[in-house]
Amino acid sequence: MSSSITPSLIAADLFSVDRLVAVVTGGATGIGLMIVKALEENGAKVYIIGRRKEVLDKVAKEEAKHGNIIPLQGDASSKPDLERIVAHITKETGYINLLVANAGISGPDPVRITPSTTLSELQRDLWSLDPSIFAQTFSVNVGTAYFSIAAFLPLLDAGNHKGNVVQSSQAIITSSIGAFGRVPLAHYAYSASKAAVTHMTKQFATALTKYKIRFNILAPGLYPSEMTAGIVKSFEQLSPEERATRVSPLGREGNTEDMAGCILWLASKAGAWLSGNVVVSDGGKLSVTPSSY
């Protein structure tokens, strides 16, 4: 049945996140901060979760355009911390419309394979990794998203009942193009963890259909952040031709406007009919590298 609401094709209405209430884990730096700024500047109330109180407070003080960035210190991989944060938001606001599970780590250093690398050298590098570091990469990049989703389901459900926005409640999980690339740009553990969290999110999209809670995946390419600072700096010296090959066909890394465009589309009425989708924002990188996407 079609909606009885008269549709608006005005961009300011279609992409509006005014009155939206969001939670962003890992929201104080990098892509998370880009998402937070885009949402808050356009009228959303945004709770940001992170471990470093001083960084959270600085973001709330310096980046909020409307005073609606609320810092909540906590570790998104800790169930007690998540329970405490959910209780706080439940008491203060009572609902959320959007969860952005963005917290993650880069994992071990990549295993480099050059034309001169011998099989014995490769085997040595693969075998030398501490199993606990491999496991930690999965625990943070997959487990943190899993427990964040589980923790905030009641508040997302409450958002549907609140009806303060037209679109139904949603969780957006930050993955990576590393989930799809066959030439690993990071360690195998990182790429595999991002492939895992991508598939898990698709399963949630299917499993929770009847509850009207949507799930989508954001898969960025190279964006500037604390994790990618060294990579971005090393690419500054490349020629335009090399940048088009190694960074993206567009010859640059992503920026705040690129990420803002993605999140405003997904989080607003414009993205209300999306669930179970993967949104790749990589300047075309996957289109010119071996990948399974």
From Swiss-Prot:
State if Translocase is listed as a keyword. no
- Spell out the CDD domains in the cross-references: SDR_c
Residues that bind NADP(+): I31, N102, Y190, K194, S225
Catalytic residues, chain numbering: S175 (proton donor), Y190 (proton acceptor), K194 (lowers pka of active site tyr)
Q: Which PROSITE patterns match?
A: ADH_SHORT
Q: Which UniProt keywords apply?
A: NADP, Oxidoreductase, Virulence
Q: Provide the disulphide bond pattern.
A: none
Q: What is its EC number?
A: 1.-.-.-
Similarity annotation? Belongs to the short-chain dehydrogenases/reductases (SDR) family.
This chain's protein is named Short-chain dehydrogenase/reductase PhomF'
